[in-house]
């Protein structure tokens, strides 16, 4: 009922009200607002890496695309990333592995397209990117 009443307000009142609402509130209202304010999220998320993994698990390609655009240079520079008993050459290879592990085909396609557009990860299927780091006797 409250939302219906808010929608019925005139546009000039809605514009005045929205000036007093913090921008972080608008991030999750629709795609346009997410595109405008997605950079504000990083400050409010305690563990950003878990946010990235959760986005991949949910196969949310729109959010994942924005995350890649913000972080791909930093991900490429993170060397020897360790996850469970695996060692990856960089964080991008881990993200690709995690997409495959969780059957996140939309996120995987976004990552492959982004890498091909920026000239990253050429001949990705030929490279041995995972090393198992368990002790053997």
Segments and roles (model prediction):
Residues 63, 106-110:
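Conserved ankyrin/ankyrin-like repeat signature
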Residues 1-73, 80-100, 128-135:
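Cullin-RING E3 adaptor/co-adaptor recruitment helices
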Residues 24, 73-74, 102, 106-107, ...:
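Alpha-solenoid repeat scaffolds
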Residues 113-137:
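Ankyrin-repeat-protein effector appendages
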Residues 67, 110-115:
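Conserved hydrophobic site in ankyrin repeats
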């Amino acid at each position: 009922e409250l939302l219906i009443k808010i929608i019925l307000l005139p546009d000039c009142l809605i514009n005045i009200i929205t000036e007093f609402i913090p921008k972080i509130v608008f991030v999750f209202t629709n795609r346009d607002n997410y595109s405008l304010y997605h950079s504000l999220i990083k400050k409010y998320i305690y563990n950003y890496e878990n946010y990235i993994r959760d986005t991949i698990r949910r196969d949310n390609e729109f959010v994942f695309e924005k995350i890649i655009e913000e972080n791909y240079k930093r991900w490429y520079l993170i060397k020897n990333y360790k996850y469970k008993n695996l060692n990856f050459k960089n964080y991008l290879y881990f993200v690709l592995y995690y997409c495959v592990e969780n059957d996140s085909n939309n996120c995987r396609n976004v990552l492959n397209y982004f890498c091909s557009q920026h000239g990253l990860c050429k001949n990705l299927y030929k490279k041995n990117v995972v090393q198992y780091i368990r002790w053997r006797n």
